[in-house]
């Protein structure tokens, strides 16, 4: 019951506020009428599972490491959220046998054509790299097939964040082609060890296709700057927040793969490109400019400047009326959450619960003090708070555009130099050709 209520609240409201955009693509590939195991990469604690399952038509179930269930209050809420404990060797060998009960519960759900989100890496790491897959997911799938004859389908899911611990950023979720556990059952009868290995190879291959991977950590900075430039080449609808297209992920995947390629084949080309990118962003910083402004060459935008002026009263009202639920989660997370893997999950959890108490309380106070008129005015508080987010974006964008045009009037040669550097970088990136006939992973 609690999980259904949160599914009604979090995807359409909480996610709309926390994420600037969500790209949720290729769900049509998933056979929703089958028992399903969604096998995703793991970057962002509890957030990953919630994102994968939020837009599925049926209830979603999760696995979480058992040490999160030690507290009785936490255990109650996790169970209400359809979360099952999984005991790892890290929790002690004496506890691993408890997974038998967990697996029985999982099989019971799968028998009803239910589903589970699992993270085969077994560890949450905020890197653009996959970790070695563990065998728990494979054992779960083979167990369901062996004991109950279930045609479990495994769906690799790529989860890619622009910045996983930051507010108003983006996340890209893409579903890979599923495979049936029955495809590996004959091998399992002959050699369970080989079947487990083959299972992980299938999942890993799917994840490698869906996840944006930077193989060499030394290239993280370079890839990130190129991703910023790639994103800024495209203007998306301003108010739209959910997209079904996979084009954005493919763009970012291609950029990362090109750097992976020249890291392996041409260190000279890599060093040259890195030097150009570094010079370009140093020029931007020195002149207090942003790549977005250079890329889009925005005009003066009289209407947007007018919206900044006319929208200011709405901004003040919306900001002040939503200040507590906006500031408190951030303050708590900044003070107490030192591990960034948990930052956004805690932020969203606190923010959602707080607003569920805050908003009715404000309506009650407004109604008692000002009657029905103020009560109905109070109903606009969430909308004004949402508009504040866009107002802030417009103000920042207008300020950056103003600085750009001011610089262009004062020093057109400098702007031309910066634009030339950007074009050189994009041309150099374009010249790197991937072999589309083979897997570059």
Predicted regions: what they are:
Residues 20, 54-60, 103, 132:
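Basic/hydrophobic alpha-helical interface regions
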Residues 13-34, 428-440:
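A short, well-structured juxtamembrane/interface segment
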Residues 303-327, 342-393:
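Alpha-helical bilayer-embedded segments of polytopic membrane proteins, i.e.
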Residues 292, 296-297, 327-345:
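Flexible internal linker/loop segments at domain or repeat junctions
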Residues 2-8, 30-94, 325, 329-338:
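Catalytic core of membrane glycerolipid acyltransferases/transacylases, capturing the structured
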Residues 20, 42, 96-100:
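A conditional alpha-helix N-cap/helix-loop micro-motif detector
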Residues 2, 95-298, 376, 380-441:
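Non-catalytic C-terminal accessory region of glycerolipid acyltransferases
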Residues 21, 214, 331-340, 368-372, ...:
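Membrane-interface elements of multi-pass transporters and channels
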């Amino acid at each position: 019951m609690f999980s259904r209520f949160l599914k009604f609240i979090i995807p359409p409201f909480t996610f709309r506020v926390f994420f600037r955009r969500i790209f949720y693509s290729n769900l049509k590939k998933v056979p929703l009428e089958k028992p399903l195991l969604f096998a995703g990469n793991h970057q962002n604690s509890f957030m990953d599972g919630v994102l994968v399952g939020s837009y599925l038509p049926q209830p979603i179930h999760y696995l979480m490491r058992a040490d999160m269930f030690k507290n009785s209050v936490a255990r109650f809420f996790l169970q209400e959220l359809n979360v099952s404990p999984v005991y790892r060797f890290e929790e002690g060998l004496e506890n691993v046998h408890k997974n038998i009960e967990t697996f029985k519960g999982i099989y019971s759900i799968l028998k009803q054509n239910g589903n589970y989100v699992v993270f085969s890496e077994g560890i949450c790491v905020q890197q653009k790299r996959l970790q070695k897959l563990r065998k728990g997911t494979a054992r779960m799938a083979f167990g369901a097939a062996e004991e109950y004859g279930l045609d479990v389908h495994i769906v690799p899911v790529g989860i890619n964040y622009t910045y996983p611990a930051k507010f108003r950023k983006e996340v890209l979720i893409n579903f890979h082609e599923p495979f049936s556990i029955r495809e590996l059952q004959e091998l399992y009868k002959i050699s369970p060890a080989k079947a487990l290995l083959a299972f992980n190879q299938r999942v890993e291959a799917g994840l490698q296709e869906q996840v944006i991977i930077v193989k060499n950590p030394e290239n993280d900075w370079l890839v990130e700057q190129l991703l910023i430039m790639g994103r800024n080449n495209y203007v998306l609808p301003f108010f739209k927040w959910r997209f079904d297209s996979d084009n954005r992920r493919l763009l970012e995947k291609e950029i990362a793969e090109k750097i992976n390629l020249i890291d392996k084949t041409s260190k000279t080309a890599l060093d040259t490109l890195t030097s150009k990118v570094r010079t370009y962003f140093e020029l931007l910083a020195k002149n207090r400019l942003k790549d977005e402004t250079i890329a889009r060459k925005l005009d003066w935008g009289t209407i947007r400047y007018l919206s900044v002026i006319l929208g200011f009263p709405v901004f003040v009202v919306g900001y002040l009326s939503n200040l507590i639920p906006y500031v408190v989660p951030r303050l708590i997370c900044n003070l107490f959450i030192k591990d960034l893997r948990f930052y956004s999950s805690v932020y969203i959890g606190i923010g959602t619960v707080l607003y569920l108490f805050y908003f009715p309380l404000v309506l009650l106070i407004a109604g008692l003090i000002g009657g029905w008129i103020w009560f109905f005015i109070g109903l606009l508080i969430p909308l004004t708070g949402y508009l504040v987010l866009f107002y802030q974006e417009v103000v920042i964008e207008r300020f950056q555009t103003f600085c750009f045009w001011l610089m262009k009037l004062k020093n057109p040669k400098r702007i031309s130099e910066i634009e030339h550097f950007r074009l050189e970088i994009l041309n150099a990136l374009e010249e790197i050709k991937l072999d589309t006939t083979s897997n570059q992973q």
